[in-house]
Curated annotation (Swiss-Prot):
Catalytic activity: Exonucleolytic cleavage in the 3'- to 5'-direction to yield nucleoside 5'-phosphates
Compartments where found: Cytoplasm
Gene: rnb
Protein name per UniProt: Exoribonuclease 2
Domain RNB stretches: 189-516
EC number of the protein: 3.1.13.1
GO biological processes: mRNA catabolic process
GO molecular function: exoribonuclease II activity; RNA binding
Length: 644
């Protein structure tokens, strides 16, 4: 009798619409219960039985129940699942398989089976890619996943690399394909094979994409020719190789090895500016005045060169600093090194006075054994030879930015707008509390930004600099010329790494159109989106592999008295993140390790400080001594403890 009763249906509808609901993200805990986080201020308790319907990170709508002053959430509807495609470790064998996602907060095994057509007999410990197929909030009885790709076996020494590349859906090897002959581009190539061009790189570098030649001119001027490898002489726009490079967008540099954007035959051989080999190049000739200004007679042209020497950063630096036993093989090469050092000095001073110079941070290099084991991690400071190449490349990129802007009005530009205008007042207020007075309007201009950066660089510590970082906007890739506040430049367009950056290949094609006096087509905005996304994924992959290798490297230091100097990089409610100075590893110090009585301590992300009993004891950028308390291999996290 109640079956089709409209009154009952209406009552049900009414009850449903009157029941309080909330949308938010599920946060799991290690104790079985969880929370529905609605926003930064509001969260609801999810009891353990209800947590079985959801997964950490799911965005859901839940019914809110109130009992005896206590509110709890009952998951009702899935808005967006946290897991769709993921990597994990297989448990069980044959017919009864499950997979544990490789995520610090997902501990439960999800029942699964191999997808049809996947010819692999999965066993305990295998790594796999899986896709979620069932979810309790979608009307299914339980969670269920399908294994879509076998990654590798559990004991493979190279798990960090293969799992990370699979997680981010990135290529594992160089692209296929060969370039048989150079294209006829209708370019006249200037023969510069007699000039003493040199390359300066790491000893192990095979993909040399820049060579330099310097010459003294009258009136204390210097000429610099930057010659860049010319892959677009081999790769036609729209060809199979070009499309593959467009998707990859960059060479992916991971600790221990790289996955090139172009076939190795091109990147490490045909295009690489090897010593004593004739190579086609795209070149830029510029004149530097006595104070390092780039004069207006910038000239881009096609050429052939023959590098006369493959020089190595450390050897060149040693020689210029009068240490070590290496010396250039001839006086002609020695003269090149001296002139290039002079150019570096001038350009460095010019940028210091008229633009901005980054503080030197060391590069950290993993030294790996045959089986991927970490033998050592060394900090490689940026020395004079690194700066010679850096200054030459920055100068060449400034030239390209100007020429493309003035001749075409577009290109692939690196743009950074400094501070987000919405943050200008908050920024000025924060600086004022530290005794620095800035105008909220002026700081949004290039000159105002540079002025502030110079004041910050003159501070005794980097603390204030770290506080204002959150107000900055991100660097972007744009087809429209625009300023790069971070470098303090009106425009910046890279073209000096076409073997490893697709955007530089595009700029090569545009510069060639300028050289030939032809019209060029503006690159589509989609390409900048693809490049930005690939850059993000490559960086995440590099970080993930690094975390894994750091955990391996420091595992035997856990629980020992070995001390490490560590810089505080971030402070949150839960504790502090630090970077070990000697090797670059990131470790976490939980708040209870800082002070036993929680109520006497305030950890403030906003202020970048830890106060104990009202006294500031730690602040971001402080360097402290720590020991390694624990290394958790399953989450690749390093827990440190301050030395008392």
């Amino acid at each position: 009798m109640f079956q089709d009763n409209p009154l009952l249906a209406q009552l049900k509808q009414q009850l449903h619409s009157q029941t309080p609901r909330a949308e938010g993200v599920v946060k799991a805990t290690e104790k079985g219960f969880g929370f529905l986080e609605v926003d930064a201020q509001k969260s609801y308790f999810i009891p353990p039985p209800q947590m079985k319907k959801v997964m950490h990170g799911d965005r859901i709508i839940a019914v809110i129940h109130s009992e005896k002053e206590r509110e709890s959430a009952e998951p009702e509807e899935l808005v967006e699942p946290f897991l769709t495609r993921f990597v994990g470790k297989v448990q069980g064998k044959n017919d009864r398989l499950a997979i544990v996602p490789d995520h610090p907060l997902l501990k439960d095994a999800i029942p699964c089976r191999a997808a049809r057509g996947l010819n692999h007999e999965f066993k305990e410990g295998d790594w796999a890619v899986a896709e979620m197929r069932r979810h309790p909030l979608k009307g299914d009885r339980s969670f269920y996943a399908e294994l879509t790709q076998y990654i590798t076996f559990g004991d493979d020494h190279f798990v960090p690399w293969w799992v990370t590349l699979a997680r981010h859906n990135l290529e594992k090897e160089a692209p296929d394909g060969v370039a048989t002959e150079m294209l006829d581009e209708g370019l006249v190539r200037e023969d510069l094979t007699a000039l003493d061009f040199v390359t300066i790189d790491s000893a192990s570098t095979e993909d040399m994409d820049d060579a330099l030649f310097a010459k003294a001119l009258p009136d204390d001027k210097l000429q610099l020719i930057v010659a860049i490898a010319d892959p677009t002489a081999w790769i036609a726009e729209g060809s199979k190789l070009d499309k593959a490079a467009k998707i990859r967008a960059f060479t992916n540099y991971l600790p221990g090895f790289n996955i090139p954007m172009l076939p190795r035959e091109l990147s490490d051989d045909l295009c690489s500016l090897r010593a004593n080999e004739v190579r086609p190049v795209l070149a830029c000739r510029m004149t530097l005045s006595a104070d390092g200004t780039i004069e207006d007679n910038i000239e881009f042209f096609a050429a052939t060169i023959e590098s006369k020497a493959k020089l190595v950063y450390d050897q060149v630096s040693d020689w210029l600093e009068n240490t070590g036993d290496w010396k250039p093989e001839s006086e002609a090469i020695a003269e090149q090194v001296r002139l290039l050092a002079q150019i570096c000095q001038r350009r460095g001073e010019w940028r210091h006075n008229h633009a901005l110079v980054f503080k030197d941070r060391p590069d950290y290099r993993f030294i790996l054994g045959e089986k991927g084991e970490v033998l050592d991690i060394v900090a490689e400071p940026r020395r004079i030879a690194n700066r010679i190449v850096e200054e030459a490349m920055i100068a060449a990129n400034i030239c390209a930015a100007r020429v493309l802007r003035d001749k075409l009005g577009f290109g692939i530009y690196n743009v950074h707008m400094g501070f987000d205008p919405a943050n200008a007042d908050a920024l000025a207020a924060l600086l004022k509390t530290h005794g620095l007075h800035v105008d909220a309007e002026e700081v949004l201009t290039l000159d105002g930004f540079c002025k502030l950066r110079r004041e910050l660089d003159a501070q005794p510590t980097g603390f204030l600099d770290s506080r204002i970082r959150r107000f900055q906007s991100f660097a972007e890739i744009s087809t429209e010329p625009g300023p790069h506040f971070g470098l303090g430049l009106e425009a910046y367009a890279t073209w000096t790494s076409p073997i490893r950056k697709y955007g530089d290949m595009i700029n090569h094609r545009l510069l060639k159109a300028v050289i030939k006096g032809e019209t060029a087509t503006r690159p589509q905005d989609e390409i900048t989106v693809q490049m930005a996304e690939r850059r993000r994924l490559n960086r995440m992959a590099e970080r993930d592999v690094g975390d894994w290798l750091y955990a391996r490297f420091l595992k035997d230091k856990a629980g020992t008295d070995t001390r490490f100097a560590a810089e505080i990089v971030d402070i949150s409610r839960g504790g502090m993140r630090v970077r070990l100075v000697d090797n670059g590893a990131i470790a976490f110090i939980p708040a209870p390790f800082l002070h036993a009585v929680r109520d006497e301590m305030v950890c403030s992300q906003e202020n970048g400080t830890v106060q104990i009993k009202g006294e500031t004891v730690y602040k971001v950028t402080d360097v402290i001594d720590v020991t390694i308390a624990e290394v958790r291999m399953e989450t690749r996290s390093i827990i440190a403890r301050p030395v008392a």
